[in-house]
């Protein structure tokens, strides 16, 4: 429970669930209020826990892509249900 309750984590998982893969800059643009430092920390934690994968292309500058693992997709489905239910209450 600690991981998903950490600020921005659910937002990141939900956003990653909306596409097959996404670059760091795209995530940051979508979540405009999150700092680069916090976003990087959350992505590292989610990767370490097996919820997301990370792919780095050796381009100049380096391009890094993120996506959900099967475990992450299960979590994203749960987050999506919560988001939809919350939207229905508003």
Where are these regions (language model features)?
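Short, solvent-exposed amphipathic helices
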Residues: 74-90
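Basic amphipathic alpha-helical segments that dock to polyanions
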Residues: 39, 43-46
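N-terminal helix-turn-helix DNA-binding core of bacterial DNA-binding proteins
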Residues: 1-38, 59, 65
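Basic, amphipathic "hinge/linker" alpha-helix immediately C-terminal to the N-terminal HTH DNA-binding motif
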Residues: 58-79
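A short, conserved structural fragment
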Residues: 47-57
């Amino acid at each position: 429970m600690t991981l998903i309750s950490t600020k921005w984590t659910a937002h990141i998982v939900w956003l990653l669930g909306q596409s097959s893969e996404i670059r760091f800059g795209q995530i940051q643009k979508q979540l405009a209020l999150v700092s680069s430092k916090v976003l990087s920390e959350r992505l590292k934690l989610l990767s370490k826990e097996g919820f997301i994968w990370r792919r780095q292309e050796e381009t100049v500058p380096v391009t890094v892509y993120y996506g959900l693992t099967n475990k992450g997709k299960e979590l994203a489905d749960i987050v999506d249900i919560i988001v939809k239910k919350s939207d229905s209450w508003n």
